[in-house]
Curated annotation (Swiss-Prot):
Expressed in which tissues: Expressed by the venom gland.
Known EC number: 3.1.1.4
Cofactor details (free text): Binds 1 Ca(2+) ion.
Substrates-to-products reaction catalysed: a 1,2-diacyl-sn-glycero-3-phosphocholine + H2O = a 1-acyl-sn-glycero-3-phosphocholine + a fatty acid + H(+)
Family: Belongs to the phospholipase A2 family. Group II subfamily.
Transcription regulation found in the keyword field: no
Purpose of the protein: Snake venom phospholipase A2 (PLA2) that has several activities. It exhibits anticoagulant activities (by inhibiting activated coagulation factor X (F10)), it shows hemolytic and cytotoxic activities (cytotoxic concentration(50)=65.8 nM), and inhibits cell migration in human skin melanoma cells (IC(50)=25.6 nM). In addition, it reduces tumor lung colonization of B16F10 melanoma cells in BALB/c mice by 65%. PLA2 catalyzes the calcium-dependent hydrolysis of the 2-acyl groups in 3-sn-phosphoglycerides.
Classification lineage: Eukaryota, Metazoa, Chordata, Craniata, Vertebrata
Residue stretches in coiled coil: none
Entry protein name: Acidic phospholipase A2 Drs-PLA2
Annotated Gene Ontology cellular component terms: extracellular region
One function term, GO molecular function aspect: toxin activity
Gene source species: Daboia siamensis (Eastern Russel's viper)
Length: 18
């Protein structure tokens, strides 16, 4: 699912952001 993939990327970016 594209949405799931996007969520995974967003989660990784969020972790890096923190």
């Amino acid at each position: 699912n594209l949405f799931q993939f996007a969520r995974m990327i967003n989660g990784k970016l969020g972790a890096f952001s923190v």
